[in-house]
Each structure stands twice: as structure tokens, then as C-alpha cells.
């Protein structure tokens, strides 16, 4: 059976979600949303930003940790 391909995007989002890391999502428009990743799938990210916000991945420019200390486990 073939091994699933390495997906750094899913790994980053999942670790951020599990560890409740506060992230800043910068949108393609330049708007910034700060909150916690609640869930995600192939096309969207559900973020706790005052209330639940569903963000389509194609509208996201970058995702960074709010305090800059987050490191992806290898």
C-alpha cells in the first residue's frame, strides 16, 4: 500500500489546532484575523475569531503564530 504524501499544510494546521496556538491569518486582501484554528478541510479553515468564522483557503495569504514562537514538530 502506498504511503500518503507528506502534507505540510495539514500538519501545520492540525498541530496549531491541537496545541491551541493563537494564529494570525492574513487574507489575500490584506485583512488580518487573529484567533484559534477549530477545524479545517481541503478547502476551508474554521477559526474562532470572536465567533466561528469559515475562511476559504484560496482567500488566505499566510498563517503565522501570533507570538512567533510556534515551531512545527518533525
What are these model-derived regions, one by one?
Residues 1-34, 38, 42, 46-74:
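Short glycine-rich, low-complexity segments
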